[in-house]
Structures are given as C-alpha cells and as structure tokens.
C-alpha cells in the first residue's frame, strides 16, 4: 500500500480510533492489471469526489485500496454473527477493508469500504478475493434499491484486478468500492458483547453503543435511557426497511445477524434477487436449503435478529437483568405492529387507495389480491403496473378476477399515486444474468443499458420494453450464489 498526499480525498479514521478492539489495521493486496469497469459518477459527485480523478491511476489506486490518502488507516472490522441460526463468534471482514470515513457534500459521514481487496486476519479459509460477476451484481442491485427509494449501501465502482480467481471455474477478479452510512451491524454488537463479557467490563460495548448513537440515532442521546432508545430506533428502522423490501418483492437471501445494519440500510447483496411470480415461499439462494430466508419469512427473521441485538444491550440498559429484559421485550414487541403498519400503508398506496377507504376493505383487497397472484402465478411487479393502467380505463392484461376488480374500482383508485410507487423496472433476474455473463467476457454494454433503465424505475421509457417484461418461460428456475 502506498500513501499519497493528494488532496483529492480526505479519509478520517473515526471507527478505527474510537473502537480499536473491533479493528485490525490492514493493507489491500495489489492488483496486477487493474481496469475500471464501472464508476458511479453521480455518487462520486455526492461524495465530493472528482469522477475524472477517480478514473486516473491514483483514483483507481484508491478504489483498490492500494493508494490511500495520508493519514488514512484502513482496517478490517471485527464482528460475530448468527449464520442460518448458528452462532459464529468471530467473523469479521475476511475479504474487505474499511478505508475510512469521508464527509459528503451534504455534511454526512459516509464509510468508504472495499470488498474483494485480499485476505485479512478474519479470512479463515477464504482467499480474500472477489470476482467480477458478484461484485457487479451488488453494484446493480444496490443502485436499483437506491433508485427505488429503499435505504441501502451504495456502490461507487467496480475495478477488475487482472487476477484470475478460482471458484467453481477460473473467473476474473474484481474489487467493489461501496459507500454506507456505516458498517455497524448487529454482529458488531455481538462481538463487542462477548469481548465485554470475557473482560468483565462493559466499556467497549458502551463505547460502541455511543458511537452508533452519535452516527445514526443522535436523538437517543437525549432520552432518559439512551441505550434503550437506541434499540427502539433500530427496531423502527428495520421494521420500515423490511416493509420496503416486501413491497417491491426483494429477497435478501442471507439475513444473518452480521448482515443487519444499525443504520437501517440494506447491506451485503450476495444471493439476493427480486421475486418474479408471487409466492411467499420463494427462495433463490443456493445455500438456503430449508427456506429460512424465503420472501415470506423475512419479517420474522428480522424480528429474531433484533432479539439477538437486544441481548447484547442488556448490560447497558439496566443494572438489573430482569428489568433490562422487560424493557427490551416491550420494545421488541413493537416490531410486528410497526412492520404491519408500514406494509399496510405501502400496499394501500400500491393499490391507489385513499384514506377514505376503511381498513377492513383495504386489507381484504390486499389479501385477496395476493392469493390471486399466487394461484395464477402472476408476475408481482407487472401486476401492479397493469392495475395502474386499468385504473385509467384500460382492460387488464393479467388474470385479475372480475369480482376483485369490481371491489377495487369501487374504491376509486388513483393511478398517479400507484405509478409513483410501483416500478416499471426492477433488476429482472434474467437481465441481471445476461449483463453479468456479458461483463465477465468483457462486454459492458448490457450492463450500461440495464443501469439506464434502473436509474428511473417508475418512468416508462421507449425502447426499454424488454426491461419491463418478466423472464421468458425457457429461463427456467433461478438460483443465486454468494460469490464467496
């Protein structure tokens, strides 16, 4: 790693400085023949970075982590986590580095983080590397989520390294540069909790909680019990996030506790995908054999993950364990209602229903529609856009029943409201695969076209009809992979 005095970027090291017990200073591995595959110019501008400079050798060095600003302290972050329900006490950034924090043009602190930058002390048996396909998948899906208005980490760039990486076959290596409000996870607190338990001292755990409050939930600092208020804020953020996932048919695929953020942002797009035909049991991940993280299970899994977060905060919330348990149990109990409220409100909007439509009528319309979509194996995203056209007087092109349509039309749905929340374009699985396959062979044109469509997901565009259509029948069953 080289250090540059270039003033093009200033990186701070607040996490490394305030929480050294959760950070190991480390260096990225050099790339033999780096080549910039994709750069998010708009995000670069938002971060106060010069996109032209990022395309230069020095800029690409930053995106690889091999050329960092003077004073920066890249670290691999420590965290634990429940993976498919089983606890792993030491996970951490096995192939990732936090380069540092920067201040964007709006004054917000953002992490600059790398994925695929080489082995760290947390790598266990892994090679620490990443390949082009999965890194571009995260770029595609995270930016699509952002365009849909869903809280998420962002993707700044993907750089091909020129190194061959062995997975099932030889594949081209790559590094993803991503941006987040932070990379604090439930797993970060699990690691700090076990550290504090072993040391018989809660000081590290308290420092982590204070860091989280300062960065993400500053209003909690004013509460009578700041750490309980922190927990309540994370519960609310996750309830909102999960509802937004469900409303657009997003399936994360690997909702381990180390993949749940304290900021309430979606993180770690591994075996993720968007649902096509509606079915609550939909699973795409090749490693989720039991369907633990199926579409319909996601709210319950989030609730379970938050219970694990609550356990780590007990020593901070009250000296008496029973009192602390009672307090977090009450707070955790708010999650189902908060999720249901956000989901119900979102579904009313997707159907164009005004506040004049009573709750019972709206709920029946939603539930009956979902049953109908599942029975007819109708594409979830297409169904709501079709209803928007029906609300304007068109004939339905999908198999809605006359009885359901009659009840819905009687509610005078607003098609303009519907079109503002029901996307035309999502990262269709077959189109994502086409783009990744082409990019792996050096053809970036399908990726560029797909990203153009996804940038404005609610606006129909001439020439992009294929990007709004479901997969052809011969696409077959879809499976996703972690890429690790």
Curated annotation (Swiss-Prot):
Keywords tagged on the record: ATP-binding, Magnesium, Manganese, Metal-binding, Nucleotide-binding, Nucleotidyltransferase, Transferase
Pfam families in alphabetical order: SelO
Active site: 258
Tree of life domain: Bacteria
Cofactor (UniProt): Mg(2+); Mn(2+)
Binding site for Mg(2+): 259, 268
UniProt enzyme class: transferase
The keyword Manganese is annotated on this UniProt entry: yes
InterPro entries: SelO (IPR003846)
Residues the record lists as binding ATP: 92, 94-95, 115, 127-128, 178, 185, 268
PANTHER family: PROTEIN ADENYLYLTRANSFERASE SELO, MITOCHONDRIAL
Similarity field: Belongs to the SELO family.
Job description of the protein: Nucleotidyltransferase involved in the post-translational modification of proteins. It can catalyze the addition of adenosine monophosphate (AMP) or uridine monophosphate (UMP) to a protein, resulting in modifications known as AMPylation and UMPylation.
Protein name in the entry: Protein nucleotidyltransferase YdiU
Provenance organism: Mycolicibacterium smegmatis (strain ATCC 700084 / mc(2)155)
Gene for this chain: ydiU
